[in-house]
């Protein structure tokens, strides 16, 4: 009974935020120092179970998906300034397009997010050009069939990259979640969550907002059958501050019936993963939502900035600063250098998993604009709680509301299940999601446009198209892992230099140190280990739910160990 009584008491955690200045030219993605992000050391078992996935990320960064030859075709490249030149060679190395011209200069452009190009993953056809990231780079070829092949290989690279991160997300949730004393409460508390976070907005940078998942009014939902009406029973809403959950205070939202393809942990520097796993996990600070987001039509983003926080530049070097310091900005500070802050300096009480019984009801928002390029979220750390724990507490309610990966009922864990975070995960030493024979077929595969009516986003279309194809292949060819040809870890890491020297891709006669570092002596099956741990988490949650069925929890906040 003492334990149950303790669950009713809210736990207040005082938090202070580091001080930031606003800059239009530089963005520091490690704005929170390691000391404030990581109060506790990472458990050794986390490194052990995630090592195979870490190897897959290393292999992906070194895969050559495409490499042109002089006799193949003529390639012309247009940079962001509009300058057009003929390329000597074009390669797709991991998620980077490497271009050389006759003067041996190199262009290196990431086709997914990078520190200099946040929340950008766009491939489109503009006239005769294949355009990347809204004109950052455009490529054309006199062989249009070859250009289409290049486009599809770019999409395969994106698919594999995101799929590895989805598997990493499932592995971190299952392994680290077992250490969280109240994980059963998190799993049994769908549609009840509120906490501060930062979101990245184009043209604004990182903005601090109040995230709230709750119920919307049923009576208002039934008034209209219009497609433009927000009809979701539950919604993820992001507010300017935590003072009001009215529609006027809402900036953007995601109903539970809106299209969301995927949600997973993310590292903006992931295109060039660190060789040090501890550094990698310290950089794993974001949540990527691939899908549609509804922006309130009357939102003034300048107003959001003034009432929230912009974290778009370097840390001032002082580490954590008190909320009082945040409030001591000079009133004469110019907009360019001013540090914005939320009301009351953002002094939080805790991350909130609200009770199962005390819910509020919001009115639906009917005046909005839908954007399809998803959302990049950075949960804010709590003192005494590792940032990975804060990430887990944040991402599961998002998955619940989006109805992804079996949630809010039970995580799907099988690698053959298209709705699982572990779907299609290669078994080392193989590092490919698709066999060579399947990739050849994908170059001419027709995709059903009727299945793609919900989005025009490159990342969402990529995950939808290639997940469906992979599911079809796994169903038809049960022994594809042994009957078809897949590249292995040594094929990728042993043939190509793991460092990019910005001149050209060099073959290697000997394996470098990274190959020795990631030896395959520990051929662990991360998929089965993660499945076992995820199942144990869910057993614990079900047992707890059964034991509490006659006495529901009544608490305003979740207990945090």
From Swiss-Prot:
Gene Ontology cellular component annotations, sorted alphabetically: cytoplasm
Location(s), subcellular: Cytoplasm
Keywords: Cytoplasm, Phosphoprotein
Superkingdom per UniProt: Eukaryota
Modified residues (Phosphoserine): 514
Main location: cytoplasm
Biased composition (Polar residues): 324-340
Sequence ranges of Low complexity compositional bias: 314-323
Miscellaneous field: Present with 3360 molecules/cell in log phase SD medium.
Name this polypeptide is given: Uncharacterized protein YJL016W
Source lineage: Eukaryota, Fungi, Dikarya, Ascomycota, Saccharomycotina
């Amino acid at each position: 009974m003492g334990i149950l009584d303790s669950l009713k008491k809210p736990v207040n955690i005082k938090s202070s935020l580091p001080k930031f200045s606003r800059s239009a030219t530089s963005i520091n993605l490690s704005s929170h120092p390691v000391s404030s992000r990581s109060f506790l050391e990472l458990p050794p078992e986390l490194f052990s179970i995630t090592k195979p996935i870490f190897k897959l990320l290393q292999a992906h960064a070194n895969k050559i998906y495409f490499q042109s030859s002089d006799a193949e075709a003529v390639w012309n490249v247009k940079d962001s300034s509009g300058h057009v030149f003929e390329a000597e060679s074009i390669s797709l190395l991991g998620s980077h397009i490497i271009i050389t011209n006759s003067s041996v200069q190199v262009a290196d452009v990431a086709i997914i997010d990078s520190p200099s190009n946040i929340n950008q993953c766009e491939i489109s056809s503009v006239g005769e050009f294949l355009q990347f990231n809204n004109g950052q780079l455009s490529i054309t070829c006199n062989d249009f069939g070859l250009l289409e092949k290049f486009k599809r290989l770019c999409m395969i690279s994106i698919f594999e990259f995101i799929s590895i991160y989805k598997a990493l997300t499932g592995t971190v949730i299952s392994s680290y979640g077992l250490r969280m004393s109240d994980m059963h409460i998190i799993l049994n508390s769908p549609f009840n969550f509120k906490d501060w976070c930062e979101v990245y907005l184009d043209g604004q940078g990182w903005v601090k907002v109040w995230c709230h998942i709750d119920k919307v009014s049923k009576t208002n939902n039934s008034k209209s059958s219009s497609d433009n009406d927000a009809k979701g029973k539950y919604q993820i809403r992001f507010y300017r501050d935590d003072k009001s959950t009215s529609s006027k205070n809402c900036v953007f939202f995601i109903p539970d019936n809106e299209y969301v393809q995927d949600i997973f942990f993310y590292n903006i520097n992931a295109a060039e993963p660190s060789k040090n796993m501890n550094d990698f996990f310290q950089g794993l600070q974001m949540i990527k939502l691939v899908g549609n987001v509804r922006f309130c039509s009357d939102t003034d983003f300048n107003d959001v900035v003034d009432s929230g926080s912009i974290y778009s530049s370097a840390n001032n070097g002082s580490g954590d600063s008190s909320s009082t310091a945040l409030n001591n900005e000079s009133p004469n500070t110019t907009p360019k250098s001013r540090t914005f802050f939320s009301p009351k300096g953002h002094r939080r009480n805790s991350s909130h998993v609200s009770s199962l019984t005390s819910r509020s009801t919001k009115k639906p928002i009917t005046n909005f604009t839908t954007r399809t390029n998803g959302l990049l979220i950075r949960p804010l750390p709590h003192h005494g709680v590792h940032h990975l724990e804060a990430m887990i507490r944040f991402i599961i309610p998002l998955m619940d509301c989006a109805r992804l990966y079996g949630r809010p009922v039970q995580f799907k864990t099988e690698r053959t299940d298209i709705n699982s975070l572990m779907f299609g995960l290669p078994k080392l030493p193989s590092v490919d999601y698709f066999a060579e024979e399947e990739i050849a077929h994908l170059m001419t595969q027709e995709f059903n446009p009727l299945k793609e009516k919900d989005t025009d986003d490159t990342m969402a279309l990529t995950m939808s198209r290639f997940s469906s194809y992979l599911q079809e292949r796994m169903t038809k060819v049960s022994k594809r892992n042994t009957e078809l040809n897949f590249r292995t870890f040594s094929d990728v890491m042993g043939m190509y230099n793991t460092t990019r020297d910005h001149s050209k891709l060099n073959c290697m006669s000997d394996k470098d140190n990274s190959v020795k570092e990631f030896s395959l002596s520990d051929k662990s099956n991360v998929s089965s280990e993660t499945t076992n741990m995820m199942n144990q988490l869910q057993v614990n949650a079900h047992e707890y739910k059964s034991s509490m069925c006659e006495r529901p929890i009544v608490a305003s906040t979740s207990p945090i160990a």
